[in-house]
Amino acid sequence: MMDRGECLMSMKLRPMVTRPSSDGTLFWPFREERAFASAEEYGGGGGCMWPPRSYSCSFCGREFKSAQALGGHMNVHRRDRARLKQQSLSPSSTDQATPPECDRQQQVLDVGSKVLVQEETRKPNGTKREISDVCNNNVLESSMKRYEHDNGEVKTDLSVGLLSTEFDPRKKQLINGSSSSWKRAKTDVSRFPMMLGLVIGISEINGHHEELDLELRLGADPPKVN
């Protein structure tokens, strides 16, 4: 007959037997938990873990240790797909928006050209000229021509350079009246050797003295001769 100590030892060494319950499940410990617990106990943590801690990406197949890391990685894929979709739709939208803008610019150019032709490119007889010829003629006629009406004839004179009394026949007639005034005027003109001017005017029409002078001068004005 065994003593009490031997009986306890035999009970510890006896394998544990589990009885099935009424619903067919086993009591604790479960087989999976016992298997992983024994692997951790004998393997020092080198065995498998339950539940599995590896999560793979369905797009690129990359594996992550946690579900949170996989979720962040999937967000990157979603943003990339949204960006590619937006880029694929953007060229069509710009192509659709470009023709109205071009039409508006063309309308503005057409209106501007019509206004130039109607307002600035008409001769007295009503005929039209080319825009380039009109621009050149307008610049020359408005800035570099001098009209003198003498005995019903129109004379064109362009004087750009040194302005002196010798270039103006009206002043020359006044100066020729007295030699002293001529010398004084000549001395006064010598004080202003360099003078750039543009004179546009009408001298005499039908015996009436009418003058319209538009002068563009560079330098000081010469003294007037009385």
Curated annotation (Swiss-Prot):
GO cellular component: nucleus
Primary site of residence: nucleus
Motif (EAR-like (transcriptional repression)): 212-216
Tissues expressing this chain: Strongly expressed in inflorescences and flowers, and weakly in siliques, seedlings and roots. In flowers, it is expressed in petal primordia and their precursor cells. Also expressed in the lateral root caps and the basal cells of lateral roots.
Biased segments, Polar residues type: 85-97
Keywords per UniProt: Developmental protein, Differentiation, Flowering, Metal-binding, Nucleus, Repressor, Transcription, Transcription regulation, Zinc, Zinc-finger
Zinc finger extent (C2H2-type): 55-77
UniProt cross-references to Pfam families, sorted A to Z: zf-C2H2_6
Residue numbers spanned by region Disordered: 80-102
PROSITE patterns: ZINC_FINGER_C2H2_1, ZINC_FINGER_C2H2_2
Compartmental location: Nucleus
Record-linked PANTHER family: OS07G0101800 PROTEIN (PTHR45801), TRANSCRIPTIONAL REGULATOR RABBIT EARS-RELATED (PTHR45801:SF113)
Domain writeup: Contains a slightly degenerated ERF-associated amphiphilic repression (EAR) motif, which may be involved in the activity of transcriptional repression.
Name the record gives this protein: Probable transcriptional regulator RABBIT EARS
Species of provenance: Arabidopsis thaliana (Mouse-ear cress)
